[in-house]
Amino acid sequence: MRAVTLKATGRVQGVGFRWATKVAADKCGVNGIVRNLMDGSVFIEAEGEDQRVQVFIDVVRQSPTDFGKVKHLEVHEVEPQNYHDFRITN
């Protein structure tokens, strides 16, 4: 089990980024949350099998929506929170 937090900056709010991230998470088979932050970035917690999480990170890095553009993606390893699905929390 691998768990990460991601912080995506760039054109990531107002472009369907959270919805596309949820779709990508469901396709990759990872659980967690995604939410907008007040600074204009997007925060993601994701967990699942190592390979699935890595594929998800790669999708987010390339932007899960054609309307968005990730300029920078911070990735941090964290302890799993045992999410049961993937949700948009705001």
Swiss-Prot record:
Catalytic activity: an acyl phosphate + H2O = a carboxylate + phosphate + H(+)
UniProt EC number: 3.6.1.7
Disulfide pattern: none
Coiled coil residues, start to end: none
Alphabetical list of InterPro entries matching this protein: Acylphosphatase, Acylphosphatase-like_dom, Acylphosphatase-like_dom_sf
SUPFAM superfamilies (UniProt xref): Acylphosphatase/BLUF domain-like
Superkingdom, taxonomy of origin: Bacteria
Entry keyword set: Hydrolase
Gene: acyP
Residues of the active site: R18, N36
GO molecular function: acylphosphatase activity
Ranges where the Acylphosphatase-like domain occurs: 3-90
Name of the protein this chain belongs to: Acylphosphatase
Family in the record: Belongs to the acylphosphatase family.
